[in-house]
């Protein structure tokens, strides 16, 4: 039978019928993307294949499993109600992904307007303005991407937005959340949201996450937060502070957890009510401030038993301006590393120490190794997560070239990254 990629076919095997679009396949096999969003592969000599007449675009895709909606550039009808104004900025990632029915691949092609069209409930919550900042997978984000995004957010707030939602890939969401937390002092909510499962999948979390994010965007929580599923069920989303959140699972819908802190609160998906657990900065409490400076030449180095101290030589000799060490337990590295820490600080490179344990607080005053690290100039990261410490270091070095001032700032709690007492 003659068929090509993107053709719609029916496959019969052992009395069971499968329908879908043809994907790239190995010789002798056929792989299809079924309407459910799942892939199925078959040996061609063991099945009956029928080419279907309807080879147009699939009408079972889209973000909500229904008809595909308007794509980039097409206007989405605005709500006539007087609702809060919320800007939704798209950067790509799974929440902005859809199936390319020609190849069956998942691509970041949906825009903010597409998301709004596909989740009509959003229009009952706020009057949205959609804007595409980028269409990339989150592993391709960098400090320049964070700065561009932050500038766009500030522009929307200055233009009168009552809240801002950023759609983002989940893999590096915590880095972006931290960067925005340090760069922007905001008078309105800035909410980062994504999804673990692409929109074509029946188990996609995108719609619920987006609705919960919209509710936070019109709330009085004037901080940078991450809003994602709180459990594997569709019952509530958690609101995580942007400097206390971490992705803790590769694929679960409730992958994001607040570390060393409780979440700011939760959004009940059924009642649409928000319940808060900790103090937070309220809407209008502080004026808008924007400090976008970032120093990209910083590194996070994980210590492992037996790893040689010459690792640090590479960064020191290559012109890096700061280091974060992810040590063991209370924040330790081999004693062989201590002279290299001294070499770095002598070169005016701040060195922050964090823990691989994630939960708990650094204390380098208990054992001799830790005390020697402090004598060499290491800075205790307190209960800051390693990844957040890296972003903080990049931001601080983007604000000052003066070593002592940088050290002073790194020891301070700037945006909730250091807490007085760790959550147990």
Swiss-Prot record:
Instruction: Enumerate the CDD domains for this protein.
Output: GatD
Respond yes or no to whether keyword DNA-binding is given for this record: no
Which Enzyme Commission number(s) are listed?
6.3.5.-
Tell me which residues this entry annotates as catalytic.
94, 170, 171, 247
Q: Matching PROSITE patterns, A to Z? A: ASN_GLN_ASE_1, ASN_GLN_ASE_2, ASN_GLN_ASE_3
GO BP annotations listed: amino acid metabolic process; regulation of translational fidelity; translation
Query: What top-level branch of life does the organism fall under?
Result: Archaea
One annotated GO molecular function is: glutaminyl-tRNA synthase (glutamine-hydrolyzing) activity
Q: How does it assemble?
A: Heterodimer of GatD and GatE.
Please tell me whether the keyword Transcription regulation is annotated for this protein: no
User: What top-level class of enzyme does the UniProt entry assign?
Assistant: ligase
Protein name as annotated: Glutamyl-tRNA(Gln) amidotransferase subunit D
Function text: Allows the formation of correctly charged Gln-tRNA(Gln) through the transamidation of misacylated Glu-tRNA(Gln) in organisms which lack glutaminyl-tRNA synthetase. The reaction takes place in the presence of glutamine and ATP through an activated gamma-phospho-Glu-tRNA(Gln). The GatDE system is specific for glutamate and does not act on aspartate.
- Belongs to which family? Belongs to the asparaginase 1 family. GatD subfamily.
- Identify the Pfam families for this entry: Asparaginase, Asparaginase_C, GatD_N
Q: Which source organism does the UniProt entry give?
A: Methanosarcina barkeri (strain Fusaro / DSM 804)
Q: Which residues form a coiled coil?
A: none
Q: Which residues form the Asparaginase/glutaminase domain?
A: 84-406
Q: Which UniProt keywords apply?
A: ATP-binding, Ligase, Nucleotide-binding, Protein biosynthesis
């Amino acid at each position: 039978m003659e068929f090509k990629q993107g053709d719609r076919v029916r496959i019969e095997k052992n009395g069971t019928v499968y329908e879908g679009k043809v994907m790239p396949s190995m010789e002798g096999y056929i792989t299809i993307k079924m309407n459910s969003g799942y892939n199925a592969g078959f040996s061609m000599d063991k099945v009956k294949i029928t080419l279907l007449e309807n080879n147009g675009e699939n009408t079972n895709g889209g973000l909500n499993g229904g008809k595909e909606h308007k794509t980039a550039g097409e206007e989405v009808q605005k709500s006539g109600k007087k609702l809060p104004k919320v800007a939704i900025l798209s950067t790509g990632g799974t929440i902005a992904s859809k199936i390319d029915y020609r190849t069956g691949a998942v691509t970041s092609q949906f825009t903010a307007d597409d998301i709004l069209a596909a989740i009509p409930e959003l229009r009952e919550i706020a009057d949205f303005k959609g804007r595409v900042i980028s269409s990339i997978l989150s592993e391709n984000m960098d400090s320049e991407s964070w700065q561009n995004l932050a500038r766009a957010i500030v522009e929307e707030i200055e233009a009168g937005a009552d809240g801002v939602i950023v759609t983002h890939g989940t893999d590096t969401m915590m880095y972006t959340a931290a960067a925005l937390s340090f760069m922007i002092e905001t008078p309105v909510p800035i909410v980062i949201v994504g999804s673990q499962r692409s929109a074509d999948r029946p188990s996609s979390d995108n719609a619920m996450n987006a609705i919960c994010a919209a509710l936070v965007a019109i709330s009085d929580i004037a901080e940078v937060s991450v809003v994602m599923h709180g459990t594997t069920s569709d019952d509530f989303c958690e609101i995580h502070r942007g400097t206390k959140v971490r992705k803790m699972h590769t694929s679960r819908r409730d992958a994001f957890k607040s570390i060393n802190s409780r979440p700011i609160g939760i959004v009940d998906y059924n009642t649409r009510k928000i319940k808060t657990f900790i103090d937070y900065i309220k809407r209008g409490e502080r004026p808008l401030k924007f400090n976008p400076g970032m120093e990209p030449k910083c590194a996070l180095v994980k210590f492992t038993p037996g790893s040689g101290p010459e690792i640090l030589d590479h960064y020191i000799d290559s012109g890096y301006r700061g280091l974060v060490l992810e040590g063991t337990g209370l924040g330790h590295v081999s004693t062989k590393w201590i002279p290299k820490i001294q070499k770095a600080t002598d070169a005016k490179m701040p060195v922050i120490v964090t823990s691989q344990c994630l939960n708990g607080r650094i204390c380098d005053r208990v054992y001799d190794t830790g005390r020697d690290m402090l004598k060499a100039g290491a800075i205790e990261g307190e209960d800051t997560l390693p990844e957040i410490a890296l972003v903080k270091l990049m931001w601080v070095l983007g604000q000052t070239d003066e070593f002592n001032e940088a050290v002073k700032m790194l020891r301070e709690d700037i945006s909730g990254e250091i807490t007085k007492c760790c959550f147990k």
